[in-house]
Amino acid sequence: MQAQERIILALDVGSREQALALVKDLAPHVGAFKVGMQLFNSCGPSIVEEINQLGGRVFLDLKFHDIPNTVAAAGRVITRLNCFMFNVHAAGGREMMRQVVEEVKNEAKKLAVAAPLSLAVTVLTSISQEQLEEEIGVKGMKLKDLVVKWALMAKECGISGVVSSPQEIEAIRAACGPEFKIVTPGIRPAWSEKNDQKRITTPGQALQMGADFMVIGRPITQAANPVEAALKIIGELEE
């Protein structure tokens, strides 16, 4: 995989115009564009089609979590939209994950297209050990152990990989093997402003830990020259 293919640019912007301007400039320099709840709910499914038309691939970050039939039906729609990746909550359980994987595979075969990569979200990065125990009710298990348990469960269900914080990359890689995809959000090059993050993981560090893809937003989108910022990160990954 080439260095630029590892970069997923987070389109955390408020309008179609802002998003498509970034896609036009950066499609040759990144592997995919992350469309999250804000942009998707603002623009609808057409934003995925427009990004594809501009030569970009889409990671649809909607974190599906519902009964198996409902999530499987969503998987069919995502396949028709020609998404590159999408994600579901591992907490939805084995049957939900199995059904969406099967539905996506069948729909892709019917349409003669590549099936999108399916990713599981394990424990949200905003959840602390205390919240896991007191609010969610999971007691007697370390957060990292639960992340690895759910990653293994997702793999057994045919899910392609996980979205993981940098802190769990190495444990997931050791448990799930080299073919299981790991997508890591919140990556920031050392030269970028840290904003509200006290600790950062750089693209190079994430790659060394075992990440396949890294989600990067503000260090590129808010740079004076986004293309130059992307090229600088590509250079770091190639070192």
Curated annotation (Swiss-Prot):
GO CC annotations on file: cytosol
Q: In which pathway does it act?
A: Pyrimidine metabolism; UMP biosynthesis via de novo pathway; UMP from orotate: step 2/2
Q: This protein's superkingdom?
A: Bacteria
Q: Which family does it belong to?
A: Belongs to the OMP decarboxylase family. Type 1 subfamily.
Q: Which residues form the active site?
A: K63
Quaternary structure note: Homodimer.
Q: Which UniProt keywords apply?
A: Decarboxylase, Lyase, Pyrimidine biosynthesis
Name of the coding gene: pyrF
Question: Where, by residue number, does substrate bind?
Answer: 12, 34, 61-70, 125, 188, 197, 217-218
> What Gene3D superfamilies does the entry give?
Aldolase class I
Q: What is the purpose of this protein?
A: Catalyzes the decarboxylation of orotidine 5'-monophosphate (OMP) to uridine 5'-monophosphate (UMP).
Q: What is this protein called?
A: Orotidine 5'-phosphate decarboxylase
Q: Which GO terms describe its molecular function?
A: orotidine-5'-phosphate decarboxylase activity
Catalysed reaction equations from the record: orotidine 5'-phosphate + H(+) = UMP + CO2
Enzyme Commission code: 4.1.1.23
A biological process from GO: 'de novo' pyrimidine nucleobase biosynthetic process
User: What does the organism's lineage look like at the top?
Assistant: Bacteria, Bacillati, Bacillota, Clostridia, Eubacteriales
Matches recorded under CDD domains: OMP_decarboxylase_like
Check the record and name the InterPro entries matching this protein.
Answer: Aldolase_TIM, OMPdecase, OMPdecase_AS, OMPdecase_bac, OMPdeCOase_dom, RibuloseP-bd_barrel
